[in-house]
From Swiss-Prot:
Gene3D superfamilies: Ribonuclease H-like superfamily/Ribonuclease H. The gene is eri1. Residues 68-153 form the Exonuclease domain. GO terms for cellular component: cytoplasm; cytosol; nucleus. It holds the Pfam family RNase_T. Mg(2+) 1 binds at residues 70, 72, 253. This is 3'-5' exonuclease eri1. Binds 2 magnesium ions per subunit. InterPro entries: 3-5_Exoribonuclease, ERI-1_3'hExo-like, Exonuclease_RNaseT/DNA_pol3, RNaseH-like_sf, RNaseH_sf, SAP_dom. Mg(2+) 2 binds at residues 70, 190. RNA exonuclease that acts as a negative regulator of RNA interference (RNAi). Acts by degrading the 3'-overhangs of double-stranded short interfering RNAs (siRNAs). Represses the accumulation of heterochromatic siRNAs leading to negative regulation of the RNAi-mediated heterochromoatin assembly. Also involved in rRNA biogenesis, trimming the 5.8S ribosomal RNA (rRNA) from a slightly longer pre-5.8S RNA in the cytoplasm. It comes from Schizosaccharomyces pombe (strain 972 / ATCC 24843) (Fission yeast). Its EC number is 3.1.-.-.
Length: 297
């Protein structure tokens, strides 16, 4: 049961005295002292929850599966990320890092609501036509379909999407995660920008199963091979491979990312989360990674 926050000077002094804290000062000083104490307690509670859900290095949960995504979104030429991008295509590939293969695929187009008419630039870039998104479900319905798709694999995803609980990061995030699966994408933008924006626009709560730590494949590749950061084509060229399908089509981009992951697995690369996100403009790096960040000279 939550303790009632003291409001009067006498109540604050009694509460501070019970905690063995100073009761000197005016009401404002006493309130600040109480708030500081509450902040410290909240940080301690979060840290205890982290310890509960994190694992030791000896017993860490290694990633077995990646959920590879590459969303496409509405766009205007020259606007970049300042544009109010809405998701129009959402693929998800369930990839087995041990078997080095795709187990299952999810794919759906999404109907935008704020700016339902695609720009000529967007249609040219993605190849997605107006008639395709006009008959597509809205984002909330696609998200429910994706949840059902992932729930279908609850026998291998540990914990399942029904059970996962993500704790909000403090100053650092544990490198080892109590999950055998993680989201993965090309750079941070799919998760920390496009998806985060979509939840913000739709005023939807962000479920624990889609936020938290994820693998930024582009940065992960850079750190593993000690090379400058590059795009999907650049990563494929490392093995003499060519892009298959149409660039900037979400499902084709995701499949080519899976080819990169497969090659890295064949070279005994151990995948781990290197980024996290909680909501729009609330994201960051996971410190103490196995592959130290590479900074090209």
């Amino acid at each position: 049961m939550n303790q009632k926050t003291p409001s009067t000077v006498e109540e604050i002094r009694i509460a501070l005295q019970e905690l063995g804290l100073s009761t000197n000062g005016n009401k404002e000083k006493l309130k600040r002292r109480w708030k500081f104490r509450e902040k410290r307690l909240e940080e301690k509670r979060k840290q205890e929850r982290y310890q509960k859900f994190s694992t030791s290095n000896e017993n860490k949960t290694c990633l077995r599966y990646l959920l590879i995504v590459d969303v496409e979104a509405t766009c205007e030429e020259g606007c970049g990320f300042s544009f109010e991008n809405e998701i129009i295509e959402l693929p998800c590939l369930l990839f087995d890092l041990i078997e080095k293969s795709i187990i299952d695929e999810f794919h759906s187009y999404v109907r935008p609501s704020m700016n339902p008419t695609l720009s000529d630039y967007c249609k040219s870039l993605t190849g997605i036509q107006q008639c395709t998104v006009d008959k597509a479900p809205i984002f909330s319905d696609v998200l429910e379909e994706l949840f059902i798709f992932l729930r279908k694999h609850s026998n291998i995803l540990v914990p399942s999407v029904d059970e996962i609980e993500i704790i909000e990061p403090l100053k650092s995030v544990p490198r080892t995660q109590p999950k055998n699966w993680a989201w993965a994408c090309d750079g941070p933008w799919d998760m920390a920008s496009f998806l985060a924006k979509q939840f913000k626009y739709d005023k939807m709560p962000i479920p624990d199963w889609i936020k938290g730590p994820f693998v930024d494949i582009r940065s992960f590749y850079k750190d593993v091979y000690r090379v400058p950061r590059t795009n999907i084509n650049g990563m494929l060229e490392h093995w003499g491979l060519q892009f298959e399908g149409s660039e900037h089509r979400g499902i084709d981009d995701a499949r080519n990312l899976s080819r990169i992951v497969k090659k890295m697995c064949s070279e005994n690369v151990e995948f781990e989360c290197n980024r996290w996100w909680m909501e729009y403009e609330k994201n960051g790096w996971i410190p103490n990674r196995s592959y130290p960040p590479y900074f090209a000279s």
